[in-house]
């Protein structure tokens, strides 16, 4: 009988499929994985500790840099925790804007995941297609916040500002004709809501394109079907949330089970898998993009018909307008004090969670009555998913490690924090 010699293999952190700085120490027996030991900490930046030394409103930007593909969803969890401490509720228009931007973020995340996952297992065309649509949504980010990635758009008590009436346009260039320029700017003549309306009309056809490339592709199915399945019971025990939990057949979604923002006012479905394998997790995320379009469309229609304030009318947390600040010395002082010293919150502890694209993103805040947190604890979904790597990959091939990591959709900004 042939004997296999076991050996140890380092997968990452310098590996194109490691999704950041993941280091997996694999114990191999031939091509089969006998054990996988994830090593984390290579992207540790002490976010939770840094937040303890800054006023509440100065730590919003740190949240963007946790899961740096799901920026506004991270902000949402943090500002919800602050709002719970303060006992305030944002205006309804702000709630709808948050809901809409959360779903824009979900599509952004899933497009990045689908392109990267496809590239990992050899489907390069999907990568080129997904980034075409992703660029449109990055422009929405830029229009509402001024930044393409680290938006810092949400605020305790609402959002930074109302949705702008104009979308950024492409400038003339020597590399594109006037006809191409007109076509590229066709949907950008109106407001952000007009642009999103147009996006919602054409994006389902784009998702159909992705599915044409992948869903019934025999190579794609050979790489994903029956790879690293997890049962519903075991997924719950392992602390899975988001698409991984729903891919295993558990219909748990905070947007439905514990509604926040305007999710109880919009209609959408929760996609659920059957087999809990990598292929089901793929199907769940693709269907989530379709459901996000439904939610965005409903939010756009409501926001068109219902103008109103986007920040709570409370000078304790809301700065004066720019006009007031430039006309009135007291408003200028108020603005300066608010952004340098912040505001004190009542003593207590709260936990606030949102359904981020990767799962439940939670923020646990402890206040001692000061203007900065006594303790901030972030509950990132990817941390729990990565912890199950060893159990999920045992007995599978080395090539399946790449499939599993892509299927988990790990981002190390939130794992290492």
Curated annotation (Swiss-Prot):
Keywords: Cell inner membrane, Cell membrane, Membrane, NAD, Quinone, Translocase, Transport, Ubiquinone. GO terms for cellular component: plasma membrane. It is a peripheral membrane protein. It catalyses: a quinone + NADH + 5 H(+)(in) = a quinol + NAD(+) + 4 H(+)(out). It is an enzyme of class 7 (translocase). Pfam families: Complex1_49kDa (PF00346). InterPro entries: NADH_Q_OxRdtase_suD, NADH_UbQ_OxRdtase_49kDa_CS, NDH1_su_D/H, NiFe-Hase_large. Its EC number is 7.1.1.-. Belongs to the complex I 49 kDa subunit family. NDH-1 shuttles electrons from NADH, via FMN and iron-sulfur (Fe-S) centers, to quinones in the respiratory chain. The immediate electron acceptor for the enzyme in this species is believed to be ubiquinone. Couples the redox reaction to proton translocation (for every two electrons transferred, four hydrogen ions are translocated across the cytoplasmic membrane), and thus conserves the redox energy in a proton gradient. PANTHER family: NADH DEHYDROGENASE [UBIQUINONE] IRON-SULFUR PROTEIN 2, MITOCHONDRIAL, NADH-UBIQUINONE OXIDOREDUCTASE 49 KDA SUBUNIT. This is NADH-quinone oxidoreductase subunit D. The gene is nuoD.
């Amino acid at each position: 009988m042939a004997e296999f010699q076991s050996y140890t293999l380092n997968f990452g952190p310098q590996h194109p499929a490691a999704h950041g700085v993941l280091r997996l120490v694999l114990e191999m027996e031939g091509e089969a994985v006998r054990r996988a030991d994830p090593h984390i900490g290579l992207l540790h930046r002490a976010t939770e500790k840094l937040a303890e030394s800054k006023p509440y409103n100065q730590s919003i930007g740190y949240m963007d840099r946790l899961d740096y593909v799901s920026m506004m969803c991270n902000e949402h969890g943090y500002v919800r925790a602050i709002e719970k401490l303060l006992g305030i509720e944002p205006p309804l228009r702000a709630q709808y804007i948050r809901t809409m931007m959360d779903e824009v973020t979900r599509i952004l995340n899933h497009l990045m995941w689908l392109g990267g996952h496809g590239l990992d297992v050899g489907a390069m065309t999907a990568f080129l297609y997904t980034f075409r649509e992703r660029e449109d949504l990055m422009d929405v980010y830029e229009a509402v916040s001024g930044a393409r990635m680290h938006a810092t758009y949400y605020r305790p008590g609402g959002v930074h500002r109302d949705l702008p009436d104009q979308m950024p346009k492409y400038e003339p260039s020597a590399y594109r004709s006037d006809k191409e320029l007109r076509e590229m700017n066709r949907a950008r003549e109106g407001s952000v809501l007009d642009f999103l309306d147009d996006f919602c009309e054409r994006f389902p056809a784009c998702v159909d394109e992705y599915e044409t490339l992948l869903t019934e592709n025999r190579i794609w199915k050979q790489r994903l079907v029956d790879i690293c399945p997890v049962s519903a019971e075991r997924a719950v025990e392992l602390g899975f949330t988001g698409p991984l939990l729903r891919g295993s057949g558990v219909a748990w979604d905070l947007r439905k089970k514990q509604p926040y923002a305007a999710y109880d006012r919009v209609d959408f479905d929760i996609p659920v898998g059957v087999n809990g394998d990598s292929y089901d997790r793929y199907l769940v995320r693709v269907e989530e993009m379709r459901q996000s379009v439904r939610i965005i469309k409903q939010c756009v229609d409501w926001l068109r018909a219902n103008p109103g304030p986007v920040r709570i009318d409370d000078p304790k947390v809301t700065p004066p307008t720019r006009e007031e600040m430039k006309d009135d010395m007291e408003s200028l002082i108020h603005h300066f004090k608010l952004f340098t010293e912040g505001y004190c919150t009542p003593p207590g502890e709260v936990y606030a969670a949102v359904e981020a694209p990767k799962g439940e993103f939670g923020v646990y805040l402890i206040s001692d009555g000061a203007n900065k947190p006594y303790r901030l604890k972030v509950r990132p979904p990817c941390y729990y998913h990565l912890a199950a790597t060893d159990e999920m990959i045992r007995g599978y091939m080395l090539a399946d490690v790449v499939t599993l990591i892509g299927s988990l959709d790990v981002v190390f900004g939130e794992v290492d924090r």
